[in-house]
Amino acid sequence: MLTFPLINDTSRKIIHIDMDAFFASVEVRDNPSLKGKPVVIARNPLQTGGRGVVSTCSYEARAFGIHSAMSAKEAYDLCPQAIFISGNYEKYTKVSKQVREIFKRYTDNIEAASIDEAYLDVTENKIGAQSAIKIAKLIQHDIFVELGLTCSAGVSYNKFLAKIASDYEKPHGLTLIMPDEALEFLAKLPVEKFHGVGKATVPKLHALGFFTGGDLQKADPVDLAERFGIYGWELFQKANGIHNSKVKNHRERKSVGKERTYGKLLYLPDDIKAELIKISKQVSESLKRHQLKGNIIILKLRYSDFTTLTKRKSMVENLDSPEDIAEAARQIFEEIDYDESLGVRLLGVTVSGFGVQKATLDMQ
């Protein structure tokens, strides 16, 4: 028989805050002459021989089709008049901490999803407000007045719906999805808008006739589970507005990684590979302390100009040995388009995908 929870907890009040074009907006705030112009956070490809990747860009740049993870060269081709800025990760981190301090005025139940987004559970809150919408508006006001930035907010009874709501109207939007509105809202939503559905999964879903949340709502959950494993169950639940994951201040460990910053830049590939061996040994030691193995290896490389490359590789077996981790990291490094002229200031190796092989369904 099938076993998975169909209980839908609609009692929580969850806010998802997503800073609007965060890095680019900070740069525009600090240099008002950039306002209204297409700003791209990446090194100018004319100065790097076409190298570099877009971290993010302003909404004016997005109007030209530019988006994050695009090559800087492609961004330039789409908009030659774009203003390219290398970016300042330390500054963005500082601003992110300032945003978090604003959150803390209303609740301590905060889960950072990334440097520019977070979930807040305001079911119980510090100002005794019954309305999550009121708190979301106050947060938007505080961030705009005190930091000169805008954010979009989504409000609903779970994290999945709050995240979708914050994406619905940007920039500086505020969207509420009530429990009795969730199914209708999700029914119209394209599957590619479901948080967690990647580019590789979309064509598979389309091939099966699943184009919207409504299609998934009518699906046979057994069939989804047989085709996609535990992910199929989760997708069926999400399409039906069910996502009972709590906002966690301290997340359950999902990865183990180590990073090193270098005062003296690394240039030679052999030097980088030697460092990856050292870092992999540290990661292995940490994995073994926590009795964990993972089948996803992630390499992070940051150039001297703060351009950051992140690439992952899925392995057949779960790993925890320093030799296996280092070999996987080396393979990833050799697959990236490494620019030896820039110099590397940071390297990182992370292992995730814990317990993937254990994620099986009870079907009898």
Curated annotation (Swiss-Prot):
Key words of the record: Cytoplasm, DNA damage, DNA repair, DNA replication, DNA-binding, DNA-directed DNA polymerase, Magnesium, Metal-binding, Mutator protein, Nucleotidyltransferase, Transferase
Necessary cofactors: Mg(2+)
Co-factor note (free text): Binds 2 magnesium ions per subunit.
Entry GO MF terms: damaged DNA binding; DNA-directed DNA polymerase activity; magnesium ion binding
Broad class of enzyme this protein falls into: transferase
One GO CC term, this protein: cytosol
Domain of life, source organism: Bacteria
Binding positions for Mg(2+) per the UniProt entry: 18, 116
GO process annotations (BP): DNA-templated DNA replication; error-prone translesion synthesis; SOS response
Main localization, broad class: cytoplasm
Subcellular localization(s) per the UniProt record: Cytoplasm
Catalytic reaction equation(s): DNA(n) + a 2'-deoxyribonucleoside 5'-triphosphate = DNA(n+1) + diphosphate
EC number of this enzyme: 2.7.7.7
UmuC domain span: 14-198
Active site: 117
Keyword DNA repair assigned: yes
Record Gene3D superfamilies: 3.30.70.270, 3.40.1170.60, 5' to 3' exonuclease, C-terminal subdomain, DNA polymerase, Y-family, little finger domain
Substrate discrimination (site feature) positions: 23
Pfam families in alphabetical order: IMS, IMS_C, IMS_HHH
Entry's family note: Belongs to the DNA polymerase type-Y family.
NCBIfam families named in the record: PRK02406.1
Xref: HAMAP family: DNApol_IV
Role noted for this protein: Poorly processive, error-prone DNA polymerase involved in untargeted mutagenesis. Copies undamaged DNA at stalled replication forks, which arise in vivo from mismatched or misaligned primer ends. These misaligned primers can be extended by PolIV. Exhibits no 3'-5' exonuclease (proofreading) activity. May be involved in translesional synthesis, in conjunction with the beta clamp from PolIII.
Known partners and oligomeric status: Monomer.
UniProt protein name: DNA polymerase IV
Protein species of origin: Lactococcus lactis subsp. cremoris (strain MG1363)
